[in-house]
Amino acid sequence: MKNSNSNPEKIYAAEKSRYDEFLKMNLSLDISRGKPSSEQLALSDGLLTALKSSNDCIGISDYRNYGFLDGIPEAKKLFSEFMGIDVDEIMILGNSSLNIMYDTLQKAMQFGIMGNEPLNKQGEIKWLCPVPGYDRHFSVTEEFGIKMINVPMTENGPDMDIVENYVNNDPSVKGIWCVPKYSNPQGIVYDDETVSRFAKLKPAAPDFRIYWDNAYMVHAFKQDLPILNLLKEAEKYGNADIVYMFGSTSKITYAGGGIAFMAASVNNLNDFRKHLSVQTIGYDKINQLMHVKFFNNVENIYKHMRKHADLLCPKFQVVMDTLQEELSDVASWYNPVGGYFVSCDLPEGTAKRTLELAKNAGVIFTPAGSTFPYKYDPADSNVRIAPSFPPVDELKLAMQVFCCCAKIAYYEKNI
């Protein structure tokens, strides 16, 4: 923070006075979740007119009727090209990739994977969790009673020495969560070496799987950063079965109202499909067709995402500018070039207090600790900031409150 070497008591008193002014404003601001703004959602309103009559619902079949358990052919073609995989390596499944991940793990727990013993009959099982990471991932493995192990993130992805040591030597390790492109919350893109090392893993457990969540694969702010295709890399080494890839259009079109997909080897998809055929007759084919008609090709998806970037960039710049102006001396953060979040590391032992003060002032953040398994951040320092939803003026004010609270929490411990 600016002037941190000046009189601490004087700075603390000034920030307390500033905080009191914020309290008088009766604020109600929420930057806790990565929700698209109304302006972003409006970019996809063409979906609502993509189908104009019942005739538009006819493809190789009448898509108003039953059938096509794992997606209509048109959607499979579009999104297999989008994911850079073969058309027989994808399934179109509902509206939520998180739901697919939950379902996939549930099936592994109850039925086992490709003939292996169900996970819930194998005693204690473990899961690798790159940190800081996505809170909803951790909630899934916690719900199933799986022991979660922290793996530190580096600027190139998870610490692969740690990953390889666990996966290649411990048969109780059954999976790892990954957000490989513009990671949640840091915005890191896994480099080629990291992806290649994932593809070359030699798991001690035959039922180990990488849960590769491509939530932000086209969410660049300016120039897109390339990333190796994990499934194709794994195929080179005869290792395709260790990969599950997930994605959705939730932050491309309508949040929670888009379509979601899973990409994997034919072996994995066949294993999943045999249970899926009991679970459902099929998903919303009309919504799938609407997305196909709206986009038509992959290039149009990228053009669409540039419109999102135009709306998001000014908001992320507000966060960067405010952090730099107010907290540069004591806090650290990644300057993301894509994705939906900013990860800020405050002085150790101050994150909870900072967000408590912010909440009392009417500004809500993702709770401290949420970016770690069991909601426990050992350093009590990491805060996830979600700039996407509020208008710029509200975001500026929220960030000012955040920085004020961070300073107060810091000086409470250091005076």
Which residues fall in each region the model found?
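Conserved glycine-rich beta-strand-loop-beta hairpin in the small C-terminal domain of fold type I
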Residues: 306-320, 331-345, 359
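PLP-dependent enzyme catalytic core of the Aspartate aminotransferase-like
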Residues: 2-12, 54, 67-69, 73-77, ...
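Conserved core of the PLP fold type I
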Residues: 61-206, 217-238, 403-414
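Conserved active-site segment immediately N-terminal to the catalytic lysine
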Residues: 206-208, 212, 225-249, 270-271, ...
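Conserved core segment of the aminotransferase class I/II
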Residues: 93, 235-313
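N-terminal "arm"/small-domain region of PLP-dependent enzymes with the aminotransferase-like
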Residues: 2-70, 74-75, 80-81, 360-363
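Conserved C-terminal alpha-helix-loop-beta "cap" of PLP-dependent enzymes
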Residues: 16-24, 268-269, 273, 344-384, ...
